[in-house]
Structure formats: C-alpha cells, structure tokens
C-alpha cells in the first residue's frame, strides 16, 4: 500500500514527472507547427491538437500541477503568491477546455438583401442526406496524412444500418496550407453499395454527390456542416473602401440586420474589424467578402469558456506582480543575495502606454502635372500618357535636379501636408516614408528622398520609365515580364493594353486568409502598395496642402481647384501655377527665389486658414531632425563596440584577479548611458512623430527590444550585465537595419488598430530583451566556467553573481512573455473571435513559455550545479525565442513557401550559431561543479 502511494505521488505530484511533461507538451506543439506547414491546418488538428492524447496531456498537466502544490505543502508554507499565480494556469486550462468541447465556430456567407439562419462549421463532417429530408452530420478525423489507417463508420439512418468505409483520402495539390482534399469511400445501405469521390475545397466546403440505394436517395458531402441559429442575419449592404487611386482594399464593413426567424426586426448593426456583433451568446466578426463585392463572409463564434479564461488571464498578471514583490519569493531572495555579493538592488520601472492609432482614409484618384495632364484612371494610365521625352532630356533633368536643388530643399521640407490619416506633417516626412517604401532605401542615383519625390511629382512622364520600384520575388518579375535578374521595375512595366497586370492577382491574394499566403502572394501585395504610392506621387493626390474653412480635412490640388468655394479655387490655382512654373524655371536657370517665395506665401496661407491644426515651426523642425539624425542606425556600432570593450575590461581584471580601472569603466558606463539616452530620445520622438506607440511593426519592435535590453543592463547594475545588454542592443539594431524590415512609419491595417494590441506587442517584445540578456549572460557564464582555475577563486563569485542576475532577468522575461502572449489572446478574441487558434506564431510563443518555465523549475530536481545548468539552458533556451521571432516567419508562415516534402533551406551561418554555444556548453561542463548558496 505504501509503495502504491509512493508511485501515485511520483506520477501525480512530482517535478520529475511535471518537467518532462512540459517538455513533451512543447515538443508536441513544435511538431504540430511543422505538420501544419507541410500538410495543412486540418492535418495538424487531426494528428495533434484535436486528438484524445493531446487532451489527456492537458488534463495530466493540470492534475500534476495541483498534485505538486499539495505535495509540496505550499499552503502550509504560506506560498500564497505562488499558489495564486499557478491557480491562474489551472483556470486558463479549464476555460480552454470549456471552449474546446462546448464552443462553436465557423463562417457565415450572406449576400446583399438576403438572410441566413445557419453557418458553416469550422470542423469537417461527413454530411448525409436521405431523400432530401433526413439529415445527419458525422464529425470525421480523416486527413490524408494517415489515409492508410482509415476506419469504417457505422451509423443508423431511418432505422436502417449505414456503413461508410473510407478507402482513400488525398490532397488535390501539393501546395502547403491548401486543405482541399478528395475522400474516396464506399457506402452500404439497403443492401446496396456505391463508391463516392467526395471533394472538399480549401474553404472546407463539401461538394455533394448523390446515388440511389434501391428506393432511397442518399446524398453525401465531405466538409463543413450547417449549424442552425435561433435567429437570422440579413445583409443590407456591403461596403468596401479602397486606397486612393487603387483597386486594393483599405477596409470593409457589413451593414446587417438581426431578425427573428419570422423576419421580425430585432436590431440593425454595422460589423467591421474590431467592431463585433454580439447576440444570444454568438459573436459575428468581419472576415472576408465576395469578389463581386455583393456578399460578406462573417466568422461566427460561441465561446462559453471566455469568462473563466479572461479571469485566468487577470489572475496570471496579478500573480506575476505578487511574486515579484513577495518578500519570501525567489525574485527578492536573489536580489538580497546580490546585495550580499556587493551588487546593487534591482528596480523595475517599465511604463506601457497605448496611444492613439489613427485610421487610413480613402481619396479620389487624380493626376496632376501643371496643366499638362488630365484626371485618369490608373488602369488606363499608359493610354493617356504624354509622348516620351528623349532619354538625353530625361538625363539632363535628373542632373539638374541632383545638382541645382540640393541647397534649396528646406522650403519644400518644411511645407506642411495633411496625410490620409489626418495627421499634419512636413513634406520631408512624406518624402522619406513614400520613397523608402517604393525603393527600400532612402536615396536613388545620387538623389535624396526629397529630390526623388519632387522629380516624380513634377516630371511624372520621366519617372514612369525609370526602374525604381523594388521587388524581391523572381516569380513576380516573370509574371510582369521584366528581367529576372533586375530587382527593380518601372511603373510602366506593370501595365499593358489590357490594363493593370496585377489587378486579378491582387484580388486573388486578398481573398486568402493571411496565414494561407505564400511568398509570391505577400510580394504581390507589397509591390501593389508601391505601385499605389508611385501613382499617388504622379497624381499629387497626397499633396493635401490647402486647408478648408468648413472642415478639418485639407484639400489636394485638384480638390482645391474644383472646390465650389471660388476663393479656395482661385488661390489654389495661383499657388500651383507659381510652384510648378517656378520649379521648372529653377531647374533650368538655378534661380530659386520665385519658388521659395511662393512656398513661404503658401505657409502663411496655411497658418491663417488651418488655425490650431497648423504645426508650430519648432514641432516641424523636430520631426525633420528625427528624420535626418537617424538615431537608431547610428547607435548600432557604438552599442556593440562599447559592450565589447567593457566586457574585455571586466574579464581581463577577473582573470588577473585585479580591480577594473575605475576611470575606464566609468567612461564606458557614461558612454553607454549617453547611447541609451539618445536611444530613448529617438523612441520618444518617433512616438511623437508617428502618433502611435513605437512597437507597431517588426522594425519598431526591434528598436524597442534593443532599448529594453540596454535598460535591463542598467537596472541590474552589473558591469557584466551592462556589457552584455549593450552588445545585445547593438545586435538588435543591426538586425533592424539589415534591409528586410521597413523603418518608415505607415498606416496600421484595421485589425492592428487595437488598444490590446499595443499592450500585447510592447510587453512581449520587451520580454525578448530580457531573455536575450539571459542568452548573453549565459554565454559569459560558460566562458567563465571554462576559465576557472584554483588560483582564480574570484571567478566563482562572479559566476554566482551573473547566475543570480541571469535568473532574475529570466523571471522577468518569462512573466512578460506569458502576460504578453495571453494579452495577445484578448486582442485576437476581440478582433476576430478566437483567442487561441494554434497559429504557428502564437504556438511558438507558447513553446518559448514552456521552455523558460521548464528552465526555472529545473532547480527543483535538486541538482548541485545550478549555475552551470542555468547558464547552459539560458543559452539553448533562447533558440525558442529566435524561432518565435524569426524562424516562424522564414519557415512556417510562407515567406519561403515550398511544395509539401521539399527540404527547408538552412543558411550556413545558422550551423555556426548553433554549434558554437553547444561547444561552449560541452567545454564548460568539465568545470561545472559549483553550487548557489542557500538563499534567504
């Protein structure tokens, strides 16, 4: 009996079981992401996520979590903070289970002026209809991945046995993430057998097939089942807004009515992104639309697990804060240990604010070039273009633009423009934003961004033929018909006699869900955006420089000229004539007085009519200062060099058993502090300039990670921590400026305009800074382990200090990563009705949480070499973060999409990135024997 009790205690309440379970869970999730990448979402769900064994794994983890707390007598030891924090995980798992087993989700397709009282399920069913009346839906676990293990299904229909024997299931094509499949099965009913070939489309729609079984007609389909609602949704009107001068969607919305089944009106409602219809427990989200723009596709969700899940999220965040402040908690014990090691105490101060994020408005397409061009539709731009100037004349204008305008750009740079978001900004900012997006760099053939913008705007016919638009995809260049080895295309290259070459392709890509888009799809959208921007410059529709007395919206040249207000029309005509003629003359004679005076007069006019919208010159100059100072790129090398120098100084003193030179260390400390202050100033200015928090895209998140890293070094008050954090900040800024991240400020897509998203991204990216610091501290510890000798006793003290700093940084990083990930679930649930969808990005974030939770709990296994274990695992564990941040995008999200079964290309440098840390771990393991003293 005693042995049975011991066995149960081991299996249900032991860290020796809990930690391997966490590792197994993380491994299963990782494998599932690669299954999804190769075989589609349905395969990953059928093989991992929706399987009984995966459900059992969740339940087992839940039981072991509870059992471990009971066995460790946490309540008796007054570990209230730890109990509260881990209880939140229990509540989250229970909420997820309620959602998993009792929730419903799917899609509803509604055409204008029609109503629907049912929706298509997200899960796949065998739908059976007998004689067009009796219906039966059987949930199926079939996937092509394990087609050789298909089992017959036995059912009863109209009191007669029905046997469905699956023979084979296979994909219709080899494209990844395409779930279209064909199920071949034999149906036996009424003593008659027939073979069916059932087609399931990529949207999970089943195509029905029918056969006669004596006197009974049996119809089968393989796909979504129709779930009936106790009410109807009627689509009154679908609205699609497009970007100015473009066929590309900007936003879309559905004007609907909620009706009773007898068509009685309950209420009208407008559904759009982040604006959800809630009714009788069901939530309706804007998902997609029909190509003819006469129908909408709504995602439908009914989630009884939402309340316990949200409560669990709240408890988790409060519990994490409690653990950090608990005087008997691990975090403050480590802090006290550092004090005993003559290290400073730790202070965490992180302010997270979510600012205003404006929307992007639509604008009427125009074309403006003095009086020489007329308003045109973009698809017909080639047909109405003026006769080509000779190549020599174009080169002459480019030469004069390069040489003459260089010292006369200030008046243009300071000219205030209202962008499509409604924000007033200097033309200098517009030029940098647009030109970098188009060219993927800030200069072109000796011209800076402002010169390029002026050239495109004043001489559009010249620039239609210049190959300047960047594209990274050879397949797209092949479709356009340009040389494959030339990364740049001209505006005229994307048009032919039939119009815009990418029009149909753009429409097709927009119909796909984001996670189903491959490399070509994403590049199509990027190039389409660049084409839109070039057209916007050609037409001068971006040049909203004329304030309106009646509204806060400023007018573009054509809007002002065509304004019913005769005064505005007259003033605009005169200003434009003087600006265009003055610029043209200036390029010929190098005399700029006329155009500069006109721009000054225009600024005075703006100030008089825009009133409080007009920016003070100090604010305009601050924005221009930010544009040209280029804080972040210039900080890269100083961060790296200063971090390396400080590291060399500290390590050399440790090896020699001497005190580091005070003046050298202070100088390096002050230099890094100045870099951090400049970095902070740059972030504040970028926040001020952009109008939203500086972590809204990949580039800004890298800036924020770099900032969080160097701040972590300062608050930890350790020279080694500061050297590591400075080096890490430099590496993060280096990665941000490699060229594949867009540094310019752009409008946010509708789904990103969320308060919850700002919090989610800021917290989760800051966690990467702390976990990145753990990686560097782990490397330092391993190097010091390798350097250990009997006569270098001071190295042991340093290793213990680094180990304490490392663990504190990891605790902070894990808490922030966990809170940030689950806050992302709140954002997703409020945006499209699902707080967890096993998307590869969120799944790998969960894997990273599991990895670091496992690392921090390894000490409960009783190892005597905790500093070595922590150092090794903090280095190796960081690969999960790298996979989350970079690997998912490269291998799992379609940036490089390959046919199923194709090998994934692995860059050569990646082998070294993995081999070197492993080599350090192996070398350090020979001198691993070092224990952390008992903490009090």
Predicted regions and their residues:
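Membrane-interfacial, low-structure loops and terminal tails that flank and connect transmembrane helices
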Residues: 1-9, 334-347, 658-663, 788-805, ...
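Hydrophobic cores of alpha-helical transmembrane segments in multi-pass integral membrane proteins
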Residues: 15-34, 52-67, 84-98, 285, ...
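Internal mixed beta-strand/loop scaffold within catalytic domains of large alpha/beta enzymes
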Residues: 133-136, 141-148, 155-169, 186-188, ...
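Membrane-interface segments at loop-to-transmembrane junctions
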Residues: 11-12, 45-49, 77-85, 337-345, ...
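Soluble non-transmembrane domains of integral membrane proteins
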Residues: 107-304, 359-627
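Internal alpha-helical transmembrane segments
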Residues: 20, 49-125, 297-346, 358-361
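Hydrophobic alpha-helical segments
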Residues: 1-49
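Bacterial N-terminal signal peptides
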Residues: 347-355
């Amino acid at each position: 009996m005693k042995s049975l009790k011991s066995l149960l205690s081991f299996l249900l309440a032991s860290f020796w079981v809990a930690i391997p379970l966490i590792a197994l869970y993380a491994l299963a999730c990782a494998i599932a992401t690669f299954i999804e990448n190769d075989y589609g979402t349905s395969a990953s769900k059928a093989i991992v996520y929706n399987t009984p064994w995966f459900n059992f794994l969740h339940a087992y983890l839940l039981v072991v979590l509870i059992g471990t707390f009971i066995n460790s007598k946490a309540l008796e030891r007054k570990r209230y903070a730890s109990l509260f924090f881990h209880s939140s995980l229990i509540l989250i798992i229970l909420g997820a289970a309620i959602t998993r087993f009792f929730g419903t989700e799917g899609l509803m397709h509604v055409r204008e002026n029609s109503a629907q009282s049912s929706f298509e399920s997200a899960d796949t069913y065998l739908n059976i209809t007998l004689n067009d009346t009796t219906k039966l839906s059987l949930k199926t676990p079939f996937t092509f991945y394990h087609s050789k293990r298909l089992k017959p299904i036995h059912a009863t229909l109209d009191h007669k046995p029905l046997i469905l024997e699956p023979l084979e299931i296979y994909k219709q094509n080899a494209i990844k993430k395409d779930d279209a499949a064909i199920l071949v099965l034999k149906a036996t009913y009424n003593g008659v057998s027939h073979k069916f070939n059932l087609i399931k489309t990529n949207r999970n729609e089943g195509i029905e097939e029918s056969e006669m079984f004596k006197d009974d007609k049996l119809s089968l389909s393989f796909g979504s089942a129709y779930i009936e609602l106790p009410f109807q949704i009627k689509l009154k009107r679908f609205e699609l807004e497009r970007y100015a001068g473009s066929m590309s969607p900007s936003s879309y919305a559905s004007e609907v009515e909620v009706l009773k089944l007898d068509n009685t009106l309950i209420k009208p409602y407008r559904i759009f992104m982040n604006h959800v219809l809630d009714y009788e427990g069901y939530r309706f989200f804007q998902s997609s639309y029909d190509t003819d723009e006469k129908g909408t596709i709504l995602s439908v969700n009914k989630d009884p697990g939402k309340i316990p899940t949200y409560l669990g999220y709240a408890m988790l965040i409060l519990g994490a804060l409690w653990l950090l402040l608990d005087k008997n908690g691990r975090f403050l014990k480590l802090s006290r240990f550092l004090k005993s090691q003559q290290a400073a105490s730790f202070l965490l101060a992180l302010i997270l604010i979510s600012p205003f994020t404006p929307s992007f408005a639509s604008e009427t397409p125009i074309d403006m070039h003095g009086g020489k061009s007329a308003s045109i539709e973009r698809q017909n731009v080639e047909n109405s273009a003026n006769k080509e100037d000779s190549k020599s004349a174009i080169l002459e204008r480019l030469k004069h633009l390069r040489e003459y305008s260089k010292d006369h750009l200030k008046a243009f740079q300071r000219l205030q423009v209202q962008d499509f978001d409604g924000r007033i900004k200097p033309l200098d900012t517009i030029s940098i934003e647009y030109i970098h997006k188009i060219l993927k760099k800030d200069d072109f053939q000796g011209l800076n961004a402002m010169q390029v913008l002026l050239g495109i705007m004043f001489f559009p016919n010249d620039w239609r033929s210049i190959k300047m638009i960047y594209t990274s995809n050879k397949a797209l260049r092949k479709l356009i018909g340009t040389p494959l080895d030339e990364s740049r295309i001209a505006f005229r290259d994307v048009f032919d006699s039939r119009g815009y070459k990418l029009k149909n392709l753009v429409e097709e890509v927009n119909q796909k869900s984001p996670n189903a888009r491959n490399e070509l799809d994403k590049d199509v959208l990027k190039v389409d955006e660049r084409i839109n921007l070039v057209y916007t410059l050609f037409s001068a529709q971006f040049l909203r420089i004329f304030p309106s007395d009646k509204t806060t919206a400023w007018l573009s040249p054509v809007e002002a000229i065509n304004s019913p207000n005769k005064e505005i029309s007259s003033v605009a005509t005169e200003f434009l004539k003087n600006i265009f003629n003055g610029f043209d003359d200036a390029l010929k004679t190098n005399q700029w007085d006329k155009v500069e005076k006109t721009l000054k007069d225009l600024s005075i006019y703006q100030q008089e009519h825009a009133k409080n919208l007009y920016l003070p010159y100090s604010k305009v100059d601050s924005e221009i200062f930010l544009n040209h100072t280029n804080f972040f790129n210039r900080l890269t090398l100083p961060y790296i060099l200063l971090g390396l120098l400080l590291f060399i100084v500290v390590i050399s003193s440790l090896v020699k058993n001497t005190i580091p030179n005070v003046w050298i260390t202070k100088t390096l400390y002050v230099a890094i502090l100045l870099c951090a202050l400049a970095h902070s100033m740059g972030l504040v200015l970028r926040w001020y300039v952009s109008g939203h928090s500086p972590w809204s895209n990949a580039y800004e998140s890298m800036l924020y990670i770099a900032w969080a890293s160097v701040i972590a070094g300062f608050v930890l008050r350790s020279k080694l921590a500061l050297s590591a954090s400075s080096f890490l900040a430099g590496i993060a800024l280096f990665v941000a400026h490699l060229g594949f991240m867009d540094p310019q400020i752009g409008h946010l897509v509708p789904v990103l305009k969320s308060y919850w998203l700002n919090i989610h991204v800021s917290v989760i990216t800051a966690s990467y800074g702390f976990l990145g610091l753990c990686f560097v501290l782990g490397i330092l510890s391993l190097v010091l382990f390798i350097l250990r000798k009997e006569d270098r006793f001071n190295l042991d003290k340093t290793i213990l200090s680094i180990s304490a700093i490392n663990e504190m940084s990891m605790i902070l990083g894990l808490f922030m990563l966990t809170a940030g990930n689950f806050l992302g679930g709140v954002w997703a649930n409020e945006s499209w009705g699902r707080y967890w969808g096993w998307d590869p990005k969120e799944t790998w974030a969960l894997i990273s949480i599991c990895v670091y939770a496992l690392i921090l709990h390894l000490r409960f296994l009783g190892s005597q070499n905790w500093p070595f274990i922590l150092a090794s695992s903090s280095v190796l564990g960081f690969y999960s973060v790298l996979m989350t941040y970079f690997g998912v995008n490269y291998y799992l999200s379609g940036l490089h999409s390959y046919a199923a079964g194709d090998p994934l290309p692995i860059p050569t440098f990646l082998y070294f990135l993995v081999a070197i840390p492993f080599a350090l771990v192996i070398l350090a393991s020979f001198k691993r024997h070092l224990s952390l003293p008992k903490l009090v």
